């Protein structure tokens, strides 16, 4: 049992992604177990420190399966540990399970991998006091951040990374995306239960482990050159020689400007062999492509079944791979081993693109991790060489670990099922004798068969039994008499609940249509007196009233303290504590007064809460909120009496039901100006209505356009009509308004076009339209409406990446190309083009380009290299800032990418030598051709040459072998008729050709160019008297701190074409320069706020020097705040500006306000001048705020505004003092709020309905500030309650 992972483990069918589970087992897996619909309890043993799932009500999926191997006295034995609660054995038989033939305990068909979830300690507070506590099922649990796919995990123990322990239970898991799994109560489990459970349900099953059965070829790319780890790697890679199905190994490594390969036997994969290969520095992309092609050819030729590639690398790749299309579909498995000392995300990102499965990726940072990393590599390769999935036979799908899996969790209404790993389909379980969930006996009607999702259905009717229409069904008086003649009856069920018309109906079969139709009904359903009653139909279609029956739901099923009750207010069933008959009725406390947890000994107990006011339903008490204060009253009704705006709930004592009364506003007087027009014109537009419990006069229509004018209500509540048509101008066209009579004796203000105007509707409307490019009639057409003086527009979709120029939409990206030039081997410039595409409304260079394509863009280059394209490496360079995720999600690229995208899109071409053949200029130096270097040597000197390891050497079978690379020729002399053969020095060497090659290459590179740095880094070296290859010495290309090349720096690489050291131009990136010059200029590399530029100068002696200066235009040295209510600083890590909101507290800025008064206000920064202003809270979902006449804050329950949530404070006025002057003197809306509140506090009196004025002013202030894009609203009651708790 100790193998059940000490980390947080969970199995949940719904949590799986399709490709994340398998129905097979092998000893390379972490572990696997079965699943069911219903997650069970979690048990954690403190004594043995292991986790156990205990499944409840899960048939037959109550199984754990995990595998392991043990070596005893030199014998390796692999077995499965199985927990199986549905088997045919007794406890005694479990001890002898190996020797039992007929047993269904050790089944493998129902096995799925467990999932491992972990706490994200990096995001857990180090201070235990900061860890949030949560009540879950009556238990106090603690919230911890968790790694994907979880968002949070809740444990019953409070701990930090420093104090973490294994002694915890899991309460709940929250998944990213919103799904949660809550674990059931498990207070009664103990060690005895666990021991008994293990004894009866757990056993060890011996298995035959799947042997490796896939023959493969191993391609190893040596791309790690770090001297501190290379020896350990070479020693540890010998472990791969234990792979039993590998038929050969090919080593690939960079060598100079080219590469080298060598084929070795698997047994020679050891340190003594690998030490012979010295890998060059650089990106291994070309080697990956070459190895991929080599392996794919072996697969195509049926020499191997699968290719295996191991990529050792310590540099980011120069290009991006698609693992699925480039490797998986070609049956090649790629495994990466990455040395990433500084955890560079760019290296990780590019290396991950090579693999399609997490276990195939291995990253380490130091020499101490080499052994563990290569062991994991070995396990990953070995697991992948066992094939249990044939794509031609698997009806499910082959997952990433090459196993046939079922497309979903197996569920069937008729049989217990499992996943058949051979076919990937769900089959009855177990195979030998399937267990049926439902039996379907034969009757006189016919033969029945159980079908998934349907149940028992007739598969074959007996004679005269098949129904004539859908609504008839055959039956027999005696089901056991299979010879009885069938009878037919209507298959129409009567109502169990009343229909929508309020009656209970029975139904009969309409033999014409085949559908059921209404037949008879009983009495009308009446008599419900509470929400917890419901209407039910009996067999005689009589409607009766019954009390609702509630049933406990998960996770409360096993909790004895909880019962299912109907809520009288809502009519909904709830899981509530059995002793809880209390409901809140005002007061300071709104929580429950009852508990059932460890503090009450897991018994249901209720205690009065201080300052709480609760009504007891067992005493027929309800809460009456309709008076001045909420109070409990004994009532015949069961619902609380509340006020809701203009409605008041009352109790009918006779019927024992509640009803609503409306506030009557029919007698409210509406006043009009006595001018003979106002009442006639405006009366239809105003009426009296109830608002916030008061009768007010409100407009009920659009009063801004009444007849030829408008209506308005003055401060004296008198309504007046204003005729202003003649002074109006149309919104579009600026036409004069004219009052015209309508056919119904009414009048309208119209705006006819000037008869003298020759402008069309499109011309008129384009001038007042807010659309982009309004005058482009291809995409915008208009119609002028004289009744409103406005225009209606018809808009067509505009082209992508278009802008408005001279009134027309112009497609900016259409047919755009970047013109590029490149100088090729003949010294001529060739032009090529890189097309640009519109992607997500951005015009960017095409993301993929074939730089050797035979098309209009690269045609000239294609023709030039056509004779020998096999030796040309064409690379498309693209900006490293390109975000592939944004591209796939149809999101725009960053501004930084757009700035450099065009500049960073170009092609490079490089000629390489393979097997002593290369691409070279012809004698005319106008074309290139394929040449065999060894054939040239033979032709020129008459001495036979052969190719070995990409170098030309004199044929080993030639009689006159060279001495110290000096070429000798055969001389035949004759004396006395006897011929004598001797060797004579020719004065030539095997180095001559390569020496000339170096000389010509440097000459061609330097010719016609000035100011080129020339540091030679390659020469010929005589090897074994015969071979004379070009050897690069990269040490010469390491930047010397004493040498200043100006704004250029050595890259540490030797150019394989020119045999000179490569230089990089220094412009704005000091990280490319040596530390000596960075320190000399005071460069801060870790400060992203500072950007630099390289400045070059020339001394009187002609010597060029350089230094780094801060580029003030690009640097973010002194960021500015966007408004007066924030400060701005630069983040030195990202270089981004950080804006911090200015904060203020009510108690500090307004010390004269008491806590009770301050409960309604929060302190806010003014966007006008940055000063602090007092602002009243707006309404929230839970709370509503106002002030009494003394300025005291009143917080009301939003759903019941008669219920005050804070302490009530009596207001006693000394007298009425008019405070209008203080308000009138205020200059801004925000200051009005301050003036009103301060006046209330200092004078200790209030204005009538002052809180309405304050609230209105506050809302206006927020409306104004919302126009500022950087405005962020407060958290309403949360912020204020934290400051004032009085």
Curated annotation (Swiss-Prot):
- Asked if the record carries the keyword Disulfide bond, the reply is yes
Signal sequence span is 1-15
> What keywords appear on the UniProt entry?
Cell adhesion, Cell membrane, Disulfide bond, Glycoprotein, Lectin, Membrane, Signal, Transmembrane, Transmembrane helix
What does its PTM field state? N-glycosylated.
UniProt keyword Disulfide bond present: yes
Protein name, per record? Galactose/N-acetyl-D-galactosamine lectin heavy subunit 2
Mark the transmembrane ranges: 1228-1248
Residue ranges in the Cytoplasmic topological domain are 1249-1286
Q: Which residues are glycosylated?
A: 200, 331, 384, 462, 652, 883, 1197, 1207
Q: What is its main location?
A: membrane
How is the subunit organization of this protein annotated in UniProt?
Heterodimer composed of a 170 kDa heavy subunit (hgl) and a 31/35 kDa light subunit (lgl); disulfide-linked.
- What's one GO MF term for it? carbohydrate binding
């Amino acid at each position: 049992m100790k193998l059940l992972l000490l980390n947080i483990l969970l199995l949940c069918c719904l949590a799986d992604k399709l490709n994340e589970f398998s129905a097979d087992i092998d000893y390379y897996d972490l572990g696997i177990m079965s699943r069911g619909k219903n997650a069970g309890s979690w048990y954690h043993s403190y004594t043995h420190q292991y986790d156990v799932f205990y499944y409840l009500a899960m048939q037959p999926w109550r199984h754990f399966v995990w595998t392991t191997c043990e070596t005893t006295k030199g014998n390796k034995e692999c077995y499965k540990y199985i927990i199986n609660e549905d088997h045919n054995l007794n406890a005694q038989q479990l001890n002898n399970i190996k020797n039992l033939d007929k047993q269904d305990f050790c089944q493998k068909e129902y096995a799925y991998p467990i999932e491992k979830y972990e706490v994200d300690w990096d995001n857990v507070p180090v201070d235990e006091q900061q860890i949030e506590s949560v009540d879950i099922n009556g238990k106090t649990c603690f919230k911890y951040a968790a790694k994907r796919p979880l968002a949070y995990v809740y444990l019953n123990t409070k701990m930090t990374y420093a104090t973490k322990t294994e002694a915890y239970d899991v309460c709940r898991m929250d998944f990213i995306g919103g799904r949660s799994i809550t674990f059931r109560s498990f207070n009664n489990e103990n060690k005895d239960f666990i021991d008994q459970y293990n004894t009866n349900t757990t056993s060890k099953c011996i298995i035959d482990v799947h042997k490796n059965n896939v023959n493969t070829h191993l391609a190893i790319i040596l791309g790690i050159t770090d001297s501190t780890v290379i020896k350990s790697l070479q020693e540890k890679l010998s472990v791969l020689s234990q792979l039993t199905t590998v038929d050969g190994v090919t080593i690939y490594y960079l060598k100079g400007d080219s590469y080298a390969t060598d084929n070795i036997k698997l047994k020679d994969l050891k340190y003594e062999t690998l030490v012979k290969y010295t890998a060059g520095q650089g990106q291994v992309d070309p080697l990956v492509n070459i190895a991929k092609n080599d392996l794919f050819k072996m697969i195509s030729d049926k020499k191997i079944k699968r290719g295996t590639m191991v990529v050792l690398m310590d540099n980011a790749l120069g290009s991006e791979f698609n693992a699925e299309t480039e490797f998986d579909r070609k049956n090649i498995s790629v495994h990466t081993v990455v040395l990433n000392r500084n955890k560079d995300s760019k290296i990780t990102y590019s290396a991950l693109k090579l693999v399609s499965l997490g276990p195939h990726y291995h990253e380490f940072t130091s020499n101490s991790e080499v052994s563990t990393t290569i062991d994991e590599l070995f396990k990953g390769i070995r697991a992948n060489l066992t094939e249990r999935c044939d794509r031609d036979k698997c009806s499910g799908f082959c997952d990433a670990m090459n196993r046939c899996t079922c497309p979903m969790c197996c569920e069937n209404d008729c049989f217990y099922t499992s996943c058949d790993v051979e076919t990937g389909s769900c089959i009855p379980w177990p195979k030998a004798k399937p267990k049926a969930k439902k039996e379907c006996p034969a009757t006189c009607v016919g033969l029945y068969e159980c079908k998934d999702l349907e149940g028992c259905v007739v598969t074959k009717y007996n004679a005269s039994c098949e129904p004539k229409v859908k609504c008839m069904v055959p039956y027999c008086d005696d089901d056991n008499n299979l010879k009885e003649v069938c009878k037919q009856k209507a298959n129409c069920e009567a109502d169990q609940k009343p229909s929508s018309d309020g009656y209970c109906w029975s139904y009969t079969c309409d033999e014409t249509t085949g559908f059921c139709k209404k037949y008879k009904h009983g009495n009308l359903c009446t008599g419900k007196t509470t929400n917890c009653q419901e209407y039910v139909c009996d067999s005689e279609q009589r409607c009766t009233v019954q009390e609702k029956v509630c049933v406990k739901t998960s996770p409360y099923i096993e909790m004895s303290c909880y019962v299912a009750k109907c809520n009288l207010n809502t009519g909904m069933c709830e899981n509530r504590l059995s002793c809880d008959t209390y409901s809140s009725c005002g007061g300071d406390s709104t929580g429950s007064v009852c508990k059932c947890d460890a503090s009450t000994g897991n018994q249901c107990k209720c205690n009065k809460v201080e300052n709480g006011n609760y009504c007891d339903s067992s005493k027929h008490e309800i809460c009456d909120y309709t008076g001045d204060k909420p109070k409990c009253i004994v009532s015949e009704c069961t619902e609380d009496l509340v006020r809701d705006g203009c409605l008041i709930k009352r109790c009918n004592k006779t019927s024992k039901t509640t009803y609503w009364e409306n506030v009557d506003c029919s007698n409210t007087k509406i006043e009009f100006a006595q001018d003979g027009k106002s009442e006639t014109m405006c009366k239809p537009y105003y009426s009296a209505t109830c608002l916030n419990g008061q009768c007010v006069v409100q407009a009920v229509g659009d009063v801004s356009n009444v007849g030829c004018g408008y209506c308005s209500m003055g401060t004296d509540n008198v309504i007046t009509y204003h005729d202003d048509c003649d002074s109006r101008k149309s919104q579009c066209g600026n036409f004069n308004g004219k009052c015209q009579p309508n056919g119904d004796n009414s009048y309208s203000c119209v705006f006819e076009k000037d008869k003298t105007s020759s402008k069309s509707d499109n011309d008129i409307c384009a001038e007042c339209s807010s659309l982009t490019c309004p005058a482009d009639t291809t995409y915008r057409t208009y119609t002028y409406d004289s009744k409103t003086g406005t225009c209606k527009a018809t808009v067509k979709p505009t082209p992508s990446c278009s802008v408005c120029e001279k009134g027309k939409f112009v497609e900016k990206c259409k047919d755009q190309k970047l013109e590029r030039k490149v100088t090729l081997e003949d010294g001529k410039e060739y032009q090529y083009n890189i097309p640009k595409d519109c992607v997500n409304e951005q015009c960017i260079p095409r993301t993929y380009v074939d730089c050797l394509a035979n098309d209009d863009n690269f045609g000239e280059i294609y023709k030039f290299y056509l004779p020998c394209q096999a030796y040309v490496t064409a690379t498309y360079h693209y900006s490293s800032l390109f975000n592939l995720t944004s591209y796939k999600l149809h999101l725009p690229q960053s501004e930084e990418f757009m700035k450099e995208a065009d500049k960073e899109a170009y092609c490079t071409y490089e000629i390489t030598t393979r097997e002593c053949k290369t691409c070279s200029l012809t004698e005319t130096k106008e074309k290139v051709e394929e040449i065999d270097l060894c054939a040239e040597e033979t032709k020129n000197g008459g001495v036979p040459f052969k190719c070995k390891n990409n170098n030309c050497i004199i044929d080993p079978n030639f009689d006159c072998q060279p001495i110290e690379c000096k070429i000798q020729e055969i001389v035949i002399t004759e004396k006395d008729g006897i011929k004598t053969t001797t060797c004579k020095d020719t004065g030539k060497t095997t180095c001559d050709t390569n020496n000339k090659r170096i000389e010509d290459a440097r000459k061609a590179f330097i010719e016609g160019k000035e100011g080129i740095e020339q540091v030679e880094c390659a020469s010929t070296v005589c090897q074994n008297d015969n071979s004379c290859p070009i050897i690069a010495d990269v040490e010469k290309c390491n930047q010397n701190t004493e040498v200043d090349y100006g704004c250029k720096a050595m890259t540490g690489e030797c150019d394989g074409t020119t045999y000179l050291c490569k230089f990089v131009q220094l412009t704005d990136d000091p990280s490319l320069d040596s530390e000596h010059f960075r320190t000399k200029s005071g460069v801060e590399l870790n400060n992203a706020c500072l950007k630099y530029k390289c400045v070059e100068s020339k001394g009187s002696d002609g010597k060029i020097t350089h230094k780094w200066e801060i580029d003030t235009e690009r640097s973010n040295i002194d960021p500015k705040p966007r408004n007066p209510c924030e400060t701005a600083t630069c983040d030195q890590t990202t270089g981004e500006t950080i804006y911090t909101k200015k904060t203020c507290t009510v108690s500090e800025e307004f010390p004269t306000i008491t806590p009770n008064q301050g409960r309604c206000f929060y302190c806010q920064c003014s966007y006008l001048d940055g000063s602090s202003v007092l602002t009243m809270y707006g309404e929230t979902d839970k709370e509503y705020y106002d002030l009494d006449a003394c300025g005291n804050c009143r917080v009301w329950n939003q759903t019941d505004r008669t219920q005050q949530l804070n302490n009530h404070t009596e207001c006693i006025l000394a007298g009425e003092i008019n405070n209008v002057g203080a308000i009138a003197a205020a200059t801004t809306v925000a200051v009005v709020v301050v003036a009103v509140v301060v006046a209330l506090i200092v004078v200790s009196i209030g204005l009538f309905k002052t809180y309405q004025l304050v609230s209105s002013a506050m809302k206006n202030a927020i409306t104004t500030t919302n126009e500022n894009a950087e405005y962020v609203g407060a958290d309403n009651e949360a912020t204020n309650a934290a400051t004032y708790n009085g």
